[in-house]
């Protein structure tokens, strides 16, 4: 049987699990997983609070998938610039897009664009060391407000309540 070549754009959990399922389902499948970042794992790496070691354990499972011979991770590749869909179609039998969420949802709140107002994605990316975010953050405010009651809002509130050395 002929080998099936598949490209996955996006090396977060969805892209890596897609590669895993495809190679298990189709014996002759080979998958290249591309990401614009130098390291894989997407929001599991760059979007989970550092004090969530159990969730970060998911990286171990994803690493096992990427270590298989039939799956290859290729980082620092920008879709649309370094690779285009016509190029991918010439070399692959199928292309899967799993590019994930890059930004916050726009909030219709007065003052949201004032200096000192930051979205969760930027702050979480900063404390997780995302390569697209500056290494410094203005931690000078005496009072902050965290809008939301979901997991990310709670993570941010917890991180802000910790001493800086933690």
Functional labels for PLM-detected ranges:
Residues 38-94:
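N-terminal Rossmann-like dinucleotide/flavin-binding domain of flavoprotein oxidoreductases
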Residues 2, 75-143:
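FAD-binding core/adjacent interface of flavoenzyme oxidoreductases
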Residues 3, 9-26, 124-166:
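Rossmann-like dinucleotide/flavin-binding elements
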Residues 26-42, 166:
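Glycine-rich FAD pyrophosphate-binding loop
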Residues 1-9, 21-32, 47-51, 83-86, ...:
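Rossmann-like nucleotide/phosphate-binding core characteristic of flavoprotein oxidoreductases
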Residues 30, 70-72, 116:
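Conserved beta-strand segments of alpha/beta enzyme cores
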Residues 20-21, 45, 107-111, 157-159:
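Short amphipathic alpha-helical segments
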